[in-house]
Amino acid sequence: MAVAGVALALLGSCGGMTDQEKAMIGKYYISAVSDTHPLLELGEDNKAVVRAIRPGELSFSVEGVWHVRNDSLVIDNDVSSIAIEEGDPSLVGTVAEHVGWPIKHYDETTLRIERAGIIYDYHRRMN
């Protein structure tokens, strides 16, 4: 009985969000790309939505699960969840099932990450 209790406690401690992840929950925008749709949504229970937008051509989103691991934002995308919001679906191309982006800086309003050698500032809105 005690062994079962310890096992349940260990399983429970593996789940949930870290304090850092809880602090990062929100919708993140790059206003040069879109002021109306967040490019990154980091939700409760580690649910994520990543949006790709090429203004006037294509906009789509994919759902996934996110975590912060080793100072990186890691997202496991569910590629079956791709939703076309605007444009031709044949333009989507390949969506990565797993991404990891180094976090360069984080505060209450800005998440700075590195993607393919380029630094991006995502601005969080509390809406």
List each language-model region with its residue ranges:
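Lipid interaction determinants
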Residues: 14-127
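Sec-dependent bacterial lipoprotein signal peptides
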Residues: 1-12
